[in-house]
Amino acid sequence: SLTPEQLAEIEQLREQRSSTLRAVSEGMEGHIYTAYPVLDHGFVRVIDYMGDDAAICQAARVSYGKGTKSVQNDEGLIRYLMRHWHSTPFEMCEIKLHVKLPVFVARQWIRHRTANVNEYSARYSILDREFYIPAPEHVAAQSVVNNQGRGDILTGEEATRVLEILKADSARAYDNYENMISQDGQQGLARELARMNLPANIYTQW
């Protein structure tokens, strides 16, 4: 969830108005700075963007020339590019996001493709006591047909026990994290070392 300081910053930014010669996407303008809740403590919000449909088409017509001659309008050209897997023109547009998400989701997200990421640093700052705990309907067994996927939903005592373990382990790990970095009566462990004990379901931001 957003802090009061972040909410105040969002309101201040949304009140600002500026003129520009850049291409403006009306659809994207409606999302600027708005935080959309994700999972139990997470969110996604658009901070900035560059380009629109016209930027994609402009790049495609420069790159492919005669290959796009039969396509008369931008919508048709974009469909043509997607259908034939011409992906580079789409990279002429960028979206700058502010995301709060569990660490294990963050690692899975960016392992598939190189990205420009400026992540909240646990070397310099203290992480919040916020962990992703799945809703009961998302607690599932390992799939017997897909090694990367989930199977049937766990129910009854097993589901309750699993959730209690997840909550207890998260709380205990954070308690130990706080104790290690505390300078009350001790020097306190360096933050870059203390963070190694935190579980992958703790929330980060980028």
Model region roles, listed by residue range:
Residues 1-206:
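Family-specific signature for flavin-dependent thymidylate synthase
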